[in-house]
Amino acid sequence: MDLKNFDISNGEAGIELTILDLDNKPTDIKIKLLCLHGKKGRAALINLVKNDKASTAHILAALTTGWSGIAQDGKELKFSPEAAEKLYEGYPIIAAQVEKFIEDARNFLKK
């Protein structure tokens, strides 16, 4: 088997996930994520563990590099690591989709 079948280097720049609504239909929400299995993802995880901040929301926020299409009270919600952590803590349906996406290395394979 060719090693290119294991190349997750796309995850170093981040891959965009489209969030689904409760009917499993795509929304306008796009979240850019690092691969948990890549160098940057592992470094972020190690840093969180060292600083004793290993909650799920912290981990997901550390692997999030940006987003679009998210509004709160009719205003665009600007990305920041702190805003990402609050998003994941307050909206478990979004957090669950992000968690499932980053756990699957196939989402980051180079095509």
Where in the sequence are the language-model features?
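Short acidic-hydrophobic surface loop/beta-edge motif
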Residues: A13-N24
